[in-house]
């Protein structure tokens, strides 16, 4: 199992380099299943939008890129892939979308089989123990009541710390409160930091 979790995945040069340093092969050779956030529509999924974005990130051939469509979730089981990638978005809505498609267990199966998971912000939260602390940071407009996430990462994350555009004082307060509760292992990340998670250890990385 290997998961690369960060605030900004490919949109920050430091976290992007950590991803590149921890893959089993060159990014351009990897086959990837990309799961878009809650804003994805049928039209966007079946357009060039996400393909162009992933190629810009460094993924290679279009035929090596799979864009998840929850209306056809069966098609995305048992793929021959190297990476599952979930980026930013509304965590509550994205987790709900994955659950409704009954794809949460499929993600777990892929990761346990050795597929590398890349999660940025929302994507990082998806594999943690719980997302209830995000009620202070994101709009739970779909009113989900089950805040347990996939539980593949033994802890919770407070991302985007120290970034002025992401209410750093509030994030520091949430981090301190979570530490006092002692319910979960708590990790905070700046926009440049990443966590490399394997079955044996968790490594915090900052790559210049």
How does the language model describe each region?
Residues 86, 95-116, 123-208:
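Active-site-adjacent pocket-lining segments in enzyme domains
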Residues 8-12, 62-66, 94-97, 136, ...:
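Short, flexible loop segments at the rims of nucleotide/cofactor-binding pockets, characterized by
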Residues 1-83:
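N-terminal beta1-alpha1 cap of cysteine-dependent amidohydrolase-like domains
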Residues 44-45, 77-79, 94-98, 129:
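Short, conserved acidic/polar surface loops in the N-terminal third of protein domains
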Residues 79, 83-89, 93:
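Ordered, amphipathic secondary-structure segments that act as subunit-interaction surfaces
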Residues 10, 39, 90, 131, ...:
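Short, glycine/serine-rich, charged loops/turns that create anion-binding
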Residues 7, 87-89, 120-122:
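Glycine-rich beta-strand-to-loop/alpha-helix junction loops that act as flexible
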């Amino acid at each position: 199992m290997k998961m690369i979790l960060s605030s900004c995945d490919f949109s920050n040069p430091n976290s992007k380099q950590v991803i590149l340093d921890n893959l089993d092969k060159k990014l351009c050779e990897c086959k990837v299943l990309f799961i878009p956030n809650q804003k994805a529509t049928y039209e966007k999924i079946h357009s060039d939008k996400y393909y162009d974005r992933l190629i810009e990130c460094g993924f290679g051939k279009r035929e090596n890129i799979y864009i998840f469509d929850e209306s056809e979730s069966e098609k995305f089981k048992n793929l021959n892939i190297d990476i599952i990638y979930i980026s930013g978005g509304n965590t509550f809505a994205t987790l709900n979308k994955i659950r409704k498609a009954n794809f949460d267990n499929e993600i777990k199966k892929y990761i346990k089989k050795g597929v590398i998971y890349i999660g940025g912000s929302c994507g990082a939260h998806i594999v943690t123990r719980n997302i209830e602390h995000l009620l202070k940071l994101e709009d739970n407009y779909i009113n989900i009541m089950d805040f347990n996430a996939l539980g593949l990462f033994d802890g919770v994350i407070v991302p985007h710390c120290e970034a002025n555009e992401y209410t750093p004082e509030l994030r520091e307060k949430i981090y301190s409160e979570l530490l006092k509760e002692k319910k979960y292992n708590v990790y905070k990340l700046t926009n440049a930091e990443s966590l490399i998670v394997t079955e044996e250890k968790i490594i915090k990385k900052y790559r210049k």
